[in-house]
């Protein structure tokens, strides 16, 4: 049975995440106005977003993404290592997190820091998480996808409820410094998403530079880049049979859910996400 770090009723994997760090993030960490924060629920495409943002910052030059690990370029604030790196870093910081809104640094909400929040169809998040967590030693293994569907719908998974995570962070969607992105839109029109991020960050890139960002952030290139594919961490034996990047597709859940599982999921989704405008989510 894997160890969990429990904080405010939510389980986190114990690999590099301590209660002390989570408390420090929540109550002590000071967000600076020039920081850029990348947020998403786990298995929503966070690393793809990091890669795109890093390449925008270098105008498509791949040297940085090919020589520095992705968790050093944009440290995970809830990890012990990431937190220590971020509090020592001078100047603008690139910060990544899967934390729910109520556990994030309170200082964010009085700062002018920019936030990019990435959302993915929770059904695909679920299937991706089922394979990822199930093939690692970080989380309890479900005996079937059906069991994992039950856990997910109740929020009994690492980082807690998808529904609560989304509802809370989306309350910021009208803020000027908040950019909402959907994984499905990123897949459908990656260049359009890259341009949207450039506009949000006030970055002007030439057409050839945009092409380089697109090229070096592709799924295949990322999968082969040891600085971005987490192969260096895989060697620590926390993952047994699967890499971080499995498919990266849209709609894979249809190959896994039974009709009754899909119906049960739809029922909970409608209940939990009531109140959002029609057409809010691109997968509806």
UniProtKB/Swiss-Prot annotation:
It comes from the Eukaryota. Signal peptide: none annotated. GO terms for biological process: 3'-phosphoadenosine 5'-phosphosulfate metabolic process; cellular response to vitamin D; cholesterol metabolic process; ethanol catabolic process; response to activity; response to insecticide; response to nutrient levels; steroid metabolic process. The keyword Lipid metabolism applies. One of its GO terms (molecular function) is bile-salt sulfotransferase activity. Its EC number is 2.8.2.2, 2.8.2.14. Induction: Induced by estrogens and suppressed by androgens. Expression is under the influence of pituitary growth hormone and thyroid hormone. Keywords: Cytoplasm, Lipid metabolism, Steroid metabolism, Transferase. InterPro entries: P-loop_NTPase, Sulfotransferase_dom. The active site is at 98 (proton acceptor). GO terms for cellular component: cytoplasm. It is found in: Cytoplasm. Pfam families: Sulfotransfer_1 (PF00685). 3'-phosphoadenylyl sulfate binds at residues 43-48, 120, 128, 183, 217, 222, 246-248. It is an enzyme of class 2 (transferase). It catalyses: an alcohol + 3'-phosphoadenylyl sulfate = an alkyl sulfate + adenosine 3',5'-bisphosphate + H(+); taurolithocholate + 3'-phosphoadenylyl sulfate = taurolithocholate 3-sulfate + adenosine 3',5'-bisphosphate + H(+); lithocholate + 3'-phosphoadenylyl sulfate = lithocholate sulfate + adenosine 3',5'-bisphosphate + H(+); (24S)-hydroxycholesterol + 3'-phosphoadenylyl sulfate = (24S)-hydroxycholesterol 24-sulfate + adenosine 3',5'-bisphosphate + H(+). Homodimer. Belongs to the sulfotransferase 1 family. Sulfotransferase that utilizes 3'-phospho-5'-adenylyl sulfate (PAPS) as sulfonate donor to catalyze the sulfonation of steroids and bile acids in the liver and adrenal glands. Mediates the sulfation of a wide range of steroids and sterols, including pregnenolone, androsterone, DHEA, bile acids, cholesterol and as well many xenobiotics that contain alcohol and phenol functional groups. Sulfonation increases the water solubility of most compounds, and therefore their renal excretion, but it can also result in bioactivation to form active metabolites. This is Sulfotransferase 2A1. It comes from Rattus norvegicus (Rat). The gene is Sult2a1.
């Amino acid at each position: 049975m894997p160890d969990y770090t429990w904080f405010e009723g939510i389980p986190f994997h114990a690999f590099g995440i301590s209660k002390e760090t989570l408390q420090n993030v929540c109550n002590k960490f000071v967000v600076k106005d020039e920081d850029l924060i990348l947020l998403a629920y786990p298995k929503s495409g966070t690393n793809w977003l990091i890669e795109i943002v890093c390449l925008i910052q270098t105008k498509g030059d791949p040297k940085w993404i090919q020589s520095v690990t992705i968790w050093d370029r944009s440290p995970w604030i809830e990890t012990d290592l990431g937190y220590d790196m971020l509090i020592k870093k001078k100047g603008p910081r690139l910060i990544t997190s899967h934390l729910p809104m109520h556990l994030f640094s309170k200082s964010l909400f009085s700062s002018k820091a920019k936030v990019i929040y990435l959302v993915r169809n929770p059904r695909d998040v679920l299937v991706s998480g089922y394979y990822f967590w199930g093939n690692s030693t970080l989380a309890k293994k479900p005996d079937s996808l059906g069991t994992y569907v039950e856990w997910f719908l109740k929020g009994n998974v690492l980082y807690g409820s998808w529904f609560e995570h989304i509802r809370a962070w989306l309350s910021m969607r009208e803020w000027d410094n908040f950019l909402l992105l959907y994984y499905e839109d990123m897949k459908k029109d990656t260049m359009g998403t890259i341009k949207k991020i450039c506009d949000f960050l006030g970055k002007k890139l030439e057409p050839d530079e945009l092409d380089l960002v697109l090229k070096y952030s592709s799924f295949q290139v990322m999968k082969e880049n040891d600085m971005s594919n987490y192969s260096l961490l895989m060697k620590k034996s926390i993952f047994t049979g699967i890499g971080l990047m499995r498919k990266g597709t849209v709609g894979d859940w249809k190959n896994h859910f039974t009709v009754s599982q899909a119906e049960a999921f739809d029922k909970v989704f409608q209940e939990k996400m009531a109140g959002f405008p029609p057409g809010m989510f691109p997968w509806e």
